Amino acid sequence: SAASDVYKRQELEKADIIVSSLPGSKSTYHLLDEEALAHVKKQPIFVNVGRGSLIDSKVLEKALKENIFSGAYIDVTDPEPLPKKNELWNLNNLIITPHVTGGYHLEETLNRIVQISATNIKNYCEGKGPINRVNLEV
């Protein structure tokens, strides 16, 4: 609706960090499109742990290359799985981790996942690399 579009724009204009855990649906498919990104506050951090279909990989790539997002941390992509030759793998301001569904972990596993994620976000904000890297050449 028009009211929800206005609300979305207003929230995007204020957010220093945009975090999505939205499910995949018709109403969330490519919800963050180029029009929505025209309304984001200057260089927020983007985190997507919901579904990759929230933002098309080409739109995400453009947002990161043009510093619309200062950086991003995702564990979901569009398409999934992300092809090895996709340009997103080469961006220094993007952290991609495996998507691990909730509710199926021992408490200590969940705590470790949160600890690693928090450390990686902190490292990114301080200009450091993640504590664990994916080697695509292996």
Please give the residue ranges for each predicted region.
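C-terminal helix-to-coil terminal segments
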Residues: E80-V138
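Rossmann-like adenosine-cofactor binding region
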Residues: S4-E87
